[in-house]
Design a protein with these regions (language model features):
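A ligand-binding cleft/hinge motif common to bilobed small-molecule-binding domains
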Residues: 81-89, 201-221
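Short secondary-structure boundary segments
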Residues: 21, 79-80, 153, 182, ...
């Protein structure tokens, strides 16, 4: 049963798999069924082994005709995918999975592992992720624990809230979040909200860092004044914002930046 409540029954293990979300592509690969992938979304880029696979659009513009030609046994997609109703009407199986929290990631690993015939692999991967996150938490310098973080999604105005998988990782690392839980996992924020919240640390993608620091009024933010900003290279940022089997790697990236900030003099 997927996260829309749809029950899926298969007479045989799916041999031809399409994934329409990078985290689901990565999940299938880590669970050991990468060779069964026959197509992926346009944003999937890890691991490098998938580079030659057909690209089939995204959640909102999946290339239905190309998908039909591939004759997949199952399509793995997000619950928010709006372009796959036609594919389902043609009799294809679409398994829709939610990925906003750590619990979602764990459930997705289990569901996909069961679907693809490797039921024990899902929990094994999750246990490895837990170990990696704990190891990252142990690396966070004590003086930074409890500091309040603003994690920006893309170039804004969305943020990773306390209830998102990113926010949950930050909590595991001992950090606080300027976004209150009642705003949801990935709320749209007014820039003035961030100014008023006065985060101690800002995290986001490196290519947006200069524009972020130059926003009106943001010079009053403690994180900007002290240049306490984690700007991640695009490849690392993609790891951070994908709710899948690289959560442990993401935690290590966050911890690494916090370690660097701890040894750099505040400005």
């Amino acid at each position: 049963r997927d996260d829309r409540g749809t029950e899926h029954r298969f007479d045989a293990l799916p041999q031809r798999i399409v994934t329409l979300l990078p985290s689901l592509t990565e999940t299938a690969w880590v669970l050991g069924v990468g060779p069964r992938l026959v197509g992926v979304d346009r944003f999937s880029n890890w691991p490098a082994d998938i580079a030659a696979l057909p690209r089939l659009g995204g959640l909102d513009d999946a290339q239905i005709e190309a998908l039909v030609r591939l004759k997949p046994d199952v399509v793995l997609a997000s619950t928010s995918a709006r372009s796959l109703d036609k594919l389902e009407s043609l009799g294809f199986r679409v398994m829709r999975l939610k990925s906003e929290t750590h619990a979602d990631v764990r459930r997705t690993l289990g569901l996909v592992a069961q679907l693809l015939g490797t039921p024990e692999a899902g929990e094994r991967v999750w246990v490895q992720l837990e170990v990696q996150i704990a190891a990252a938490a142990a690396r966070v310098p004590a003086p930074l624990k409890g500091q309040r973080v603003y994690f920006e999604i893309g170039g804004g105005p969305y943020a990773a809230g306390t209830r998102s998988f990113i926010g949950e990782t930050l909590v595991r690392l001992g950090m606080a979040n300027i976004v209150p839980p009642d705003l949801g996992p990935f709320p749209k924020l007014n820039p003035e909200f961030v100014v008023r919240a006065r985060p101690d640390l800002i995290m986001g993608v490196q290519r947006e860092q200069a524009a972020l620091l130059a926003r009106p009024g943001w010079q009053a933010i403690p994180a900007v004044q002290g240049q306490r900003v984690c700007g991640f290279a695009s490849a690392d940022y993609e790891t951070l914002i994908r709710p899948g089997p690289r959560l442990g790697e993401a935690a290590a990236l966050l911890a690494g930046c916090l370690q660097r900030l701890a040894v750099e003099p505040a400005r």
